């Protein structure tokens, strides 16, 4: 299956997404720190990045821009509990494939990941 990076400032949120996607057969790398996640992306290819919008030092949108400059083919799903029109538009402008609102249902998460990985 796919290699997926998950970045959220909340450890439990990372673990929830990790557990759901590993059960679906994906290899998941979870991070709560932006620098660690970007360092991983620089050294390892991932198929998909799942990014929370609200992080510790930067926004998920800023991290998305950095990931796209490092590995343009990496697909991305943005997650947030605080959706705004601005972050939605900016996420899509920078190349996000999906923008989901938390809390997200496990089945919806699996379906969204499968669709994004297929290119839809």
Mark where each language-model region is.
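Charged docking surfaces used in two-component/phosphorelay signaling
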Residues: 15-23
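Short hydrophobic/Thr-rich beta-strand motif most characteristic of the beta2 strand and flanking loop
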Residues: 25-33, 40
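Acidic catalytic/metal-coordinating carboxylates
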Residues: 33, 59-62
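Short amphipathic alpha-helix used as the core "switch/output" element in two-component signaling
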Residues: 39, 61-73
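C-terminal output helix
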Residues: 104-113
């Amino acid at each position: 299956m796919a290699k997926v990076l998950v970045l959220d400032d909340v450890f439990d949120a990372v673990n929830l997404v990790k557990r759901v996607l590993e059960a679906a057969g994906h290899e998941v790398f979870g991070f709560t720190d932006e620098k660690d996640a970007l360092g991983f992306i620089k050294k390892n290819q991932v198929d998909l990045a799942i990014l929370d919008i609200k992080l510790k030092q930067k926004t998920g949108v800023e991290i998305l821009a950095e990931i796209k400059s490092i590995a343009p083919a990496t697909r991305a799903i943005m997650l947030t509990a605080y959706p705004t029109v601005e972050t939605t538009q900016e996420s899509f402008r920078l190349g996000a494939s999906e923008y989901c609102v938390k809390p997200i249902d496990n089945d919806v998460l699996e379906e969204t990941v499968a669709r994004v990985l297929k290119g839809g």
